[in-house]
């Protein structure tokens, strides 16, 4: 009987072992006991009593939202009222703060401002990139002492008669002019008394048909225009200096003739300047 009461599970608290006297030759193994009178339970006032009223206050009064998916356990989401939703008021423009007003009217203005900011930023970045690239390339260029000793070789067969061709030499424009016979005779016939900077034509050339000059005006350093001016030679558009076909100043504010660089002919059609 005791073993049955022990294995009764949840019914064990309400079961008890008793014995009764049965007439027989054997003496009872267990003395009969009188069940004790149960004491009245004492309630703990600090613990909440589980009643219908207390449980009804904890019950969910709103509809539940259940989510079920494949390979995931089912879950129930209760409604939360303590979540603060950001409104991004500080990041929005004044034209679109009013949710009841259409933002299409201010769309063009807002797009124009965005395009303007993008264009200005692009120009600034391009200018900064240009400076960086320029400095990087300049660092790989030849030094000043190397440029000072630089020479340039010119093929004279590429310059037709009566034409002037410009080159770059030591950072300056270099004019090479193939003169006609008429120009040679006219420049040789000029009297030195008519010149501001007297110099004979034959003193400025090694071959009469070739004139080699540095294309920098002796007034303020502008670059003259070839085959222009009152004397058919060179004309400075900055302040109106006129040079003849030999590079001598004839009219205007320039004080000196165009400079003749050092050069030598290494062949009939090849000249080396420098």
UniProtKB/Swiss-Prot annotation:
Mitochondrion as UniProt keyword: yes
Gene coding for it: UQCRFS1
Cofactor: how bound: Binds 1 [2Fe-2S] cluster per subunit. Fe-S cluster delivery to the Rieske protein is mediated by components of the iron sulfur (Fe-S) cluster assembly machinery that reside in the mitochondrial matrix (including HSC20 and LYRM7).
Highest taxon of the lineage: Eukaryota
Mitochondrial matrix side: 79-103
Membrane topology, from the record: Single-pass membrane protein
Organism: Chlorocebus aethiops
PROSITE patterns in the cross-refs: RIESKE (PS51296)
Record family assignment: Belongs to the Rieske iron-sulfur protein family.
Keyword Transmembrane helix attributed: yes
Mitochondrial intermembrane side: 141-274
MF terms in GO: 2 iron, 2 sulfur cluster binding; metal ion binding; ubiquinol-cytochrome-c reductase activity
Sequence positions that bind [2Fe-2S] cluster: 217, 219, 236, 239, 241
Keyword annotations from UniProtKB, A to Z: 2Fe-2S, Disulfide bond, Electron transport, Iron, Iron-sulfur, Membrane, Metal-binding, Mitochondrion, Mitochondrion inner membrane, Respiratory chain, Transit peptide, Translocase, Transmembrane, Transmembrane helix, Transport
Rieske domain boundaries: 187-272
Disulfide links within the chain: 222-238
Source organism phylogeny: Eukaryota, Metazoa, Chordata, Craniata, Vertebrata
Record localization: Mitochondrion inner membrane
Alphabetized CDD domains for the sequence: Rieske_cytochrome_bc1
InterPro entries reported for this sequence: bc1_Rieske_TM_sf, Globular_prot_asu/bsu, Rieske_2Fe-2S, Rieske_2Fe-2S_sf, Rieske_Fe-S_prot, Rieske_Fe-S_prot_C, Rieske_TM, Ubiquinol_cyt_c_Rdtase_Fe-S-su
Enzyme nomenclature, EC number: 7.1.1.8
GO cellular component, one term: mitochondrial inner membrane
PTM comment: Proteolytic processing is necessary for the correct insertion of UQCRFS1 in the complex III dimer. Several fragments are generated during UQCRFS1 insertion, most probably due to the endogenous matrix-processing peptidase (MPP) activity of the 2 core protein subunits UQCRC1/QCR1 and UQCRC2/QCR2, which are homologous to the 2 mitochondrial-processing peptidase (MPP) subunits beta-MPP and alpha-MPP respectively. The action of the protease is also necessary for the clearance of the UQCRFS1 fragments.
Other facts: The Rieske protein is a high potential 2Fe-2S protein.
SUPFAM superfamilies from the UniProt entry: ISP domain, ISP transmembrane anchor, Non-globular alpha+beta subunits of globular proteins
Catalysed reaction equations from the record: a quinol + 2 Fe(III)-[cytochrome c](out) = a quinone + 2 Fe(II)-[cytochrome c](out) + 2 H(+)(out)
EC class: translocase
Protein name: Cytochrome b-c1 complex subunit Rieske, mitochondrial
């Amino acid at each position: 009987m005791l073993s049955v009461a022990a294995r009764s599970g949840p019914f064990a608290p309400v079961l008890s072992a008793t014995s009764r006297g049965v007439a027989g030759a054997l003496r009872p193994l267990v003395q009969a006991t009188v069940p004790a009178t149960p004491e009245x339970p004492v309630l703990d006032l600090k613990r909440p009593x589980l009643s219908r009223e207390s449980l009804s206050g904890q019950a969910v009064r709103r509809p539940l939202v259940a989510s079920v998916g494949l390979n995931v356990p089912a879950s129930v989401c209760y409604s939360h009222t303590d979540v603060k939703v950001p409104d991004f008021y500080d990041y929005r423009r004044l034209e679109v703060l009013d949710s009841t007003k259409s933002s299409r009217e201010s769309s063009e203005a807002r797009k124009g401002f965005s395009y303007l900011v993008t264009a200005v930023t692009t120009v600034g970045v391009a200018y900064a990139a240009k400076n960086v690239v320029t400095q990087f390339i300049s660092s790989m260029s030849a030094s000043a002492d190397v440029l000072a000793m630089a020479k340039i070789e010119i093929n004279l067969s590429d310059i037709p008669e009566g034409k002037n061709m410009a080159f770059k030499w030591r950072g300056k424009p270099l004019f090479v002019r193939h003169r006609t016979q008429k120009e040679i005779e006219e420049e040789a016939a000029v009297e030195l008394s008519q010149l501001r900077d007297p110099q004979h034509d034959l003193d400025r050339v090694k071959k009469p048909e070739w004139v080699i000059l540095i294309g920098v005006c002796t007034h303020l350093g502008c670059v003259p225009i070839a085959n222009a001016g009152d004397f058919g030679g060179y004309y400075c558009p900055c302040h109106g200096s006129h040079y003849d076909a030999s590079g001598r100043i004839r009219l205007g504010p320039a004080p000196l003739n165009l400079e003749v660089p050092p050069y030598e002919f290494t062949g009939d059609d090849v000249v080396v300047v420098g």
